[in-house]
């Protein structure tokens, strides 16, 4: 089995995340994309939408995708979880022949600061989803995504056109309340 892990806060999930998943399924030789929402990103101090709410939104959004799995491992941990922990868990669970880890290009400047980065880089092949304003070095496999959407911006100004229709109204109500 070959899998790609796509971790993130998804606070909120948006059409850019869907575009990344679709491109990964099209361009990578994989059986599944496993989406792993964080409980709390180790580089952040808080979240707005609760982990269980973000998990529920992701399950609704990706229900029609038979090659996408939503993994609640980090949410169940109830604490910030390092990528290396999740990778080791998923390696034990699936024993993949190939393991990709999808990140946004905005993560590249701090990737070397990830917990046990050297070990992690030997266990996975990083795949970088492009984002406006960030260059991707040639050493990385790249997924071109032409969505200029920011979860940070959507928390402040939720806009329906950037949100998955199945959860758009719910997300807008949540962030406007």
From Swiss-Prot:
Enumerate the InterPro entries for this protein: Cyt_trans-like, NadD/NMNAT, Rossmann-like_a/b/a_fold
List the EC numbers from the record: 2.7.7.18
**What Gene Ontology molecular-function terms does this entry list?**
ATP binding; nicotinate-nucleotide adenylyltransferase activity
What keyword terms does UniProt attach to this protein? ATP-binding, NAD, Nucleotide-binding, Nucleotidyltransferase, Pyridine nucleotide biosynthesis, Transferase
Q: Which GO terms describe its biological process?
A: NAD biosynthetic process
List, alphabetically, the CDD domains matched.
NMNAT (cd02165)
Q: Which pathway is recorded for this entry? A: Cofactor biosynthesis; NAD(+) biosynthesis; deamido-NAD(+) from nicotinate D-ribonucleotide: step 1/1
Q: What class of enzyme is it?
A: transferase
Which reaction is this enzyme known to catalyze? Answer: nicotinate beta-D-ribonucleotide + ATP + H(+) = deamido-NAD(+) + diphosphate
The entry's function note states:
Catalyzes the reversible adenylation of nicotinate mononucleotide (NaMN) to nicotinic acid adenine dinucleotide (NaAD).
> What does the similarity note say?
Belongs to the NadD family.
Write the protein's name: Probable nicotinate-nucleotide adenylyltransferase
Organism of derivation: Nitratiruptor sp. (strain SB155-2)
Classification of source organism: Bacteria, Pseudomonadati, Campylobacterota, Epsilonproteobacteria, Nautiliales
State the encoding gene: nadD
